[in-house]
Amino acid sequence: VTTKLKDLPLNGMLLCAIATLLAGCQATGGSNDSMMPGGGQAGTTPRGTSAELAQRAQQTPTGDRLETARLRTELAFNYFQRGQMAVALEEIKAALAADPVYGTAFNVLGLINMDLGENAKADEAFRKALTILPNDSDALNNYGWFLCQTKRERESIDRFMQALKNPLYASPDKPYLNAGICSQRLGNEPAAEDFFRKAVSLDPLNASANLRLGDIYFRRNDFERARAHVDRVNKNYDPSAESLWLALRIERKAGDRVAESSFAAQLRRRYANSEEFLLLQQGKFE
């Protein structure tokens, strides 16, 4: 049995919890801002709770259509993060009613439709966002992740590379991480390793990129490098079932039974109901 790292982020770590995994709101210049990547996180968090944003939206002067659109979009994203998709869609409709060319609203609409499995609608929304914001790195990253999720990996990598052309992009590690994941899906391990290494060089604590590098080196029997990347995750974040399982398998393969037993005990204590603990009980280490 071959266990694979999950494409979306890890319990209590970073990323789209998942793809898990999502972001916030970041000004990009001009009249639009942009919201977060599908495969990672970027920007700041929305500027208040749902109740605060709703109150501010109601108090916004009727003529200030851009501010209304911005607040409604942030409110929609709050609901999206909480899994309240019907309410999120209503808020996005209100945002676009206020400003039909507010690119960030189309970006968030794409994320919502992607989560709902409405792929045609998601594709249309992302394309509209990029028609309005053709060089927006977050929108490019989000659309790239959508393309990867819908088995258009080569096209997705092109979008991630476009996202990286902006020298002011605040989260360049995220497109590199996503490009690595999509390269693995294409079976291109050397490219994936290179992308993950670039992600880690930009953000040494990027949990998903570190675990993926750890997994690559584990499968090559390069235990020292594998251990270094997994240890970085387990020492800086609350360990997940996935990170403990990888650490356990590294030590087992390296022949360190004491360390293996320690990780097994942690996995049992923390994640007794996890898929990883079931694999441990079944003795399926590869």
Q: What do the predicted segments below correspond to?
A:
Residues 64, 98, 132-133, 166-168, ...:
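Structural marker of alpha-solenoid helical repeat scaffolds
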Residues 74, 108-111, 142, 176-178, ...:
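Canonical tetratricopeptide repeat
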Residues 26-93, 97, 281:
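N-terminal leader/linker segments that initiate helical-solenoid repeat arrays
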Residues 32-38, 47-60, 235-286:
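Terminal, low-structured helical/coil segments at or just beyond the last alpha-helical repeat
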Residues 62, 69, 103-104, 137-138, ...:
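Helix-start (N-cap) detector for alpha-helical repeat units in TPR-like alpha-solenoids
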